């Protein structure tokens, strides 16, 4: 692969050169062998081709975790608590409002609103919560609830995923985040989060959201036990869905933070990911995910 000539298919009208879509094999070669400077230059060029005005945007937002109670027990997570733990919580409306007021004071426009997968909360709780926020703070975009939260709300409430999404959308939910994807490979998921939803269910939730006109983001957490091939499988799954729906507004990735997790106890060989590794994967993701308009960090 001559990376200096590579151009994504959706850039055909803007540039010349080899228009073929990058394959999994080519992506693996880039990860393993290509010079980081060349990767960065090509990824930056693709960004400039997609966004010729050379504007890089940002959003002032705030993470609000409405509960830390969760039954899924992911091995990579140091956040969750069980219902009877002393430091388990569900935020009150007043506590949520205080956090949003603090966000507004610094010019914020969005909340990333999610939590643990609470074993008892049903759709009515979430409808009332979203409606409260949207009614009191209509200027704030609610980017909330991961695919596993949506799936469990559907199951415990005995309704469909589509109904959950539509009901929350009607109350003010703007978009949903990509959390819960980690690595979309069943071997990895069985190892690090065996109680979590499957690849297919994560895809189904996002596809359903796109079908009702709700945008979402796609995410990836790397640096656990996955291989480079499994990272590329993850990218392929989200690229394939984007080809159908065009519903992802951005791709975001981050590295595994191992402190106080069960996963690092079970796999002490896991090493902290370097800045070079992050930049390498970020650049190849920009090249591979040719139908994603934005890479977010």
Describe the residue ranges of each PLM region.
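Conserved short loop/turn motifs at secondary-structure junctions
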Residues: 27-30, 60-64, 115-119, 222-225, ...
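Conserved C-terminal portion of the radical SAM core fold
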Residues: 115, 136-137, 169-181, 200-262, ...
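Active-site mouth loops of central-metabolism enzymes
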Residues: 62, 80-93, 149-160, 191-196, ...
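N-terminal pre-triad scaffold of radical SAM enzymes
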Residues: 40-81, 88-114
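Flexible, acidic/Gly-rich N-terminal and inter-domain linker regions that tether
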Residues: 1-72
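Amphipathic, non-transmembrane alpha-helical secondary structure
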Residues: 28, 37, 93-101, 105, ...
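Radical SAM/AdoMet-radical enzyme domain recognition
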Residues: 74, 110, 123, 127-221
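Alpha-helix N-cap and loop-to-helix initiation/capping positions
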Residues: 3, 91, 121, 125, ...
